[in-house]
């Protein structure tokens, strides 16, 4: 089932080969500590298995957006507490998000001059992605329990800065991904499972 949707998701990720980009909104460096966003879980209530492919795709896109938004909140708050992501992700997608949070919290950051700068990162901007196609397939005896969302991810408006203010080196800001979202029968909820870089610009 094909869908077209432009989604804005504030996220951060380390410059990892898997994710191919990073993203989040940053706290205002001139603002007080009270202005820094507090991470909040956007996980919904328990839901039954999908009744159709359309329903599965809609649920998968919703949790994917929540996942990216929560990553942004976690990292904008300093990356020290990635626990809100556990309600939205599992497997490799959770590992990527936790590693991104650690990157933000601890550094070092490789800057555009290819110098590693110690200390935590700060970020600004947000990542956009556009769904190209999406489809469901069986997962652990649940019809349409696995949704693959093929998308163009655009991180051109997102920037990461090292602790000295220099901009971080980053890969191609526009690249193709297959996002995989699963229905977890035990938890009765949708979880982002994998972020697969296809290695192509878009």
Locations of the language-model features?
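Solvent-exposed, flexible loop/coil residues
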Residues: 5, 78, 162
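Bacterial signal peptide processing site
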Residues: 22-25
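Core segments of small alpha/beta cavity-forming domains
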Residues: 44-120
